[in-house]
Amino acid sequence: MKLSRILSGVVVPALLLAQPLRSPFPFLPALQTPLEPVWWEQLQDSSGNGGWLIPRGGELHARDGTPRRLFGVVLYNTACFPDSTTAIAVAQRLQALGFNAVALVGIDYSNWDASSILQSGTSSSALSPAQMQRLDWFISQLARHNIAVFLALHARWTPRTGDGVPRRDSIPTYGRAVLYTDSAFQQRHRAIVRLLLEHVNPYTGRAYRSDPAIAGVWLTWDNSLLNFWVNNRLHHPGGILSHFHSRQLDTLFAAFLRRKYGSDAALRAAWSVPAADTQNFIPNGSFEDEFSLQWTFSSNSAVAQAVFRLTETNVRHGRFAGLVRIARTNGSPSSVILYNGTQVQQDRLYELRFWARASRPQRPLRLQVYNGEFPYQNLGLYRDTVLGTAWQEFRLRFRAPETAPAARLIFYLGQDTGEVVLDDVRLHMLDESPLQPGESLATVSIARSLYGDLLGATPQRMRDNVEFYTELQQRYYESMSRFLRDSLGYRGIILAGTLLSTFNDLWSMQAMDGIVGSTGWDYRRNRTEPQGSWFIANTPMLGHTAAGNLPGIARASVRDKLSIGLFSMPFPSAHMAEMPLLLSAYGAYQGWDAVFLNYGADSRETYTTPFVRRDKHYELWAHSAVMSLAPSAAIAFRNGLIRLGRDSLPLQQTRAALLRPQWQQGSFWLRFGADNRIMLFRRVFFDSLEASQQSVQPQRQVPELREPDLSRLLSDTEELLWNALDTLFTVTTPRYIAVTGRLKGILQVGPLRVERLDSGWVGTVTWLSLDTAPLPQARRSLLTAVSRACNSDAVWEGSTSIWQGWGTAPMVLEALQLRLSWESTADTILVYGLDSLGRLASGPFSVDRLPGGRVSFRLDQTALPQHTPWFLIEQRWKPTDTTSVAEDGEPPAAWLRVTPHPAGRSGRVEFLLPPTAAAATLLLIDPLGRTQPLWHGRADGALREVALPALAPGLYWLELRSGHYCIRHPVLVSP
């Protein structure tokens, strides 16, 4: 039964999604015309406005002490330098859609003037006045719209010919790796940083270093020396470094060793290991003692039929060999096993030798050295090989990560039927040489070890390599932080980088204000044939049974440090609507301080292009589904509508783990791993990076993971539910409800019942209270409903590519047909459709009364009046009903707005008064103080719109009065 559910949840959607969008309709939140988010703007805080954002106790605060959360987007390259008109439109759009943070990346190119702060020329000694004018204006507009700006200080820069950096022409792309190792490179780059941060923005009147608008900086972007070492990219040839820069790193390594040891003799002594114990650690390895066999045989009778016995026929050594005959198997290697007890010592090098043959060629065999006691981990050897019909000797070396007196050597034999014969099995500890011939500190000839060279480097030699690279990276981050703080006086948030490939990366960043985790789901894969073709997997992250890639952000959480997450998904994935919901929901639950969609745009042209440009898989600026969901996801995250995890699960790391990165397992880099799903049930963070003992299988502290129900991965607040079997995720809080994923049939999400009426598969619905009341009692609420989004005329190849039929404008959404119902005591319920500017555009649509006090609304995006993802739900109570009156502490429900503003030849006034039944008047007051009535009626809670008369240029005032309400609003009429 479970298998069929998994198949229906993963395989079937892929088949269905091969079809074009069903009943698509054009929609995109306006690009250039200012949005008018009057319905939800009162729920947006003022992060980034009026003062520095302050890290305190691992949380972000405004200057008045108010906690802040940032919902941001990353902008790249020329998108960081819009023209003046576009800058205003971009800032306004971001604010209207709920964003209150922006990261600007790729502003430091050396060879692309349109995407650089630097003056064109042969050196990097001056800023470009034209480019800085663009950047200054853009930052001022972002600040004006309460959007915090983060700058990547190094992302693309490499030295120019006149910068005085040796061998600049052989520096890797974007200066990666060399940023940490080349002092001349670092010195020149600091001069650029000084130029930038001492530059005075004429529109704010402040230098960047003292401008709270520049809320934070990244020291580097998508860069990590440790990551390059892990991937064996720091040698020449074969890596990213030239011969010069590889030798430069060799020199630094030799200097590190000289400081630590002083001489070759001391180095040799430190890197040496004791003489090996030469015994065979496999008792009765030749099967000669038939009365004390030592070997244990096991066959799972439910899926296999097999026997083990000694044989005297065609043996390799002595009288006997061990024979396993398998008559039946399901193909699982572990269905038939043969093992022997042994022991291993931590960090020692071993060689396993054995002879084997099989009854048929190409016979698979798996072997492992495994701990027979808790925590039952692999002990350095886990290998698949193939046997032939003739005797063959196998030699396998491994290094033991731990001491294990109850280890086991296991042969896994269940892959195939037939016979397997083993003989002369030996396990020996090996001697090791600390230095290779000719290696010496004096001649700078001590080779740096490859990350994967566990067998060729003694343990202490490898640890010194680890310490060297970690120290280099940490030293760069901390010296740059001191430069920013002490030399430049910068007061904003300082972040190191975005790559966390090892625990060592995290360690190197511990002096920063916060840690950043960057990850994503799915990616573009290029194909060799046909030329230029590509595909994506197009699978839902919600179908992943281990929390997808969200643990890649969760591991960036450290006690008393800010936690920041970046996430990306590729267009045209059908599942991109999962991204804003999952990121904001688990970000709030885990207590992350900022989340960024990565990325919004990477060129100026993107801002005015009403579709996703060809091959721009990660640009979100014109993605209808993601951008339509942004307001509700952002407000829920920023305003704490989703509760912080009730219980925490602090993780412990150790310095010993730091020095053994090859044994850092899983997302949280623990030696014995961790179930990634711990973050779905508890708030997870590193409590200490230098604990006396590392956390061991922390999932044992989560009872729900002892026998996990994959359809009910429920947070301890009971607000977030990840159903991996049905690829469904729900958020259930008093003021915010959301469901995304496999939207089929009937679903109950808190008070909201969602029934899918069409034959579609993917869908997302969010329902957000626009006042302080729970959703069933909310006077106004925002309903957002989206499915797949794609360019017009896109042609799918199966379900994974549109490389030949990318499509063009306009961006379209797949229509949803839903029946929504909830319990309500309101006397009148009206639903309005909002247009791409956020204005009332259609409706009101009535709802049906159901038995038991429930109401029902049919949402049909195939019908023209409902060609929108945004719906405003208005619930009214009779004037005598006290529930319609603003309660103590609740903000007034009355509001007034003029659009457009400044007004031109025409304009209109939109306003609402709470249903008090009091007389109401709207007056226009001209520059001479004369009044003109525009409307008279009663405050009945209705949304109203009144046209402005033709007015001469000047400053006017509107006055809306009703009972104790009085709203005055300026009206500027432009020529």
Language-model-detected regions and their locations in the chain:
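Extracellular and organelle-lumenal recognition/adhesion modules and their flexible linkers in secreted
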Residues: 274-444
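A glycine-anchored, Pro-Gly-centered beta-turn/N-cap motif
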Residues: 318, 347-348, 390, 827, ...
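Glycoside hydrolase catalytic-domain groove-lining segments
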Residues: 335-337, 438-451, 457-458, 463-467, ...
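Long, low-hydrophobicity ectodomains and other hydrophilic envelope-associated domains
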Residues: 634-833
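C-terminal outer-membrane/trafficking sorting elements
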Residues: 888-899, 903-975
